[in-house]
Curated annotation (Swiss-Prot):
Sn-glycerol 1-phosphate binds at residues 169-175, 200-201, 222-223. Its EC number is 2.5.1.41. This is Geranylgeranylglyceryl phosphate synthase. It comes from Methanothermobacter thermautotrophicus (strain ATCC 29096 / DSM 1053 / JCM 10044 / NBRC 100330 / Delta H) (Methanobacterium thermoautotrophicum). It is found in: Cytoplasm. Mg(2+) binds at residues 22, 51.
Amino acid sequence: MKVEDYFHDILRERKIHLTLIDPEEQTPEEAVEIARAAIRGGTDGIMLGGSTTDSSELDNTARALRENIDVPIILFPGNTTGVSRYADAIFFMSLLNSTNPYWIIGAQALGAATVKKMGIEALPMGYLVVEPGGTVGWVGDTKPVPRNKPDIAAAYAMAAEFLGMRLFYLEAGSGAPEHVPEEMIALVKRCTDQILIVGGGIRSGEDAARVAGAGADVVVTGTVVENSDNVEDKIREIVEGMGSV
């Protein structure tokens, strides 16, 4: 089954949770243990990537995951090095509010042939960085959307939808002190029919409930997993929070 179809099947019943693993933060073996714990906690898939990912570390981690877990592995590339044949799909995304054309379409053009050759399912996605933006905001030369300007985010989302992007990601940044504002999530969801993904600053079941309740179809957590002593329990808390709305 294609990953996009998998998403739609789940969304007929409930929200989706994805766990983000950065290959540079642990060994492939440790990544497998994190993924297994997250799956036991209720996650629906593993996102793999980071803002500064090394291709060899990514490939080794993707292969280890492929051999040991059954949920989809979705690449979350920070550059052209963020591609591996061992993944099921890739968020083929444009960093919409970058000031550098490289991140809007240049890197995508450079990586497209590799994705095609490897036969990875490409999920067309608009990616928007919201204040504070974190590492991705700095690396990606962005003008982060102000937290009190939901209409700007909605305008980007509608433009992305009209350009054919079927997914839209609101990103507060890895380790952000707060998640994307609920008003912004709600307005974007009202304005488009895209699968709406929200990540950054989601640390608790309460955070996840607010984000999902505002309209997020997919909730992503990463830093909270890296910092947790009990990944299974933390993911379960977040997934249960999402299920409460």
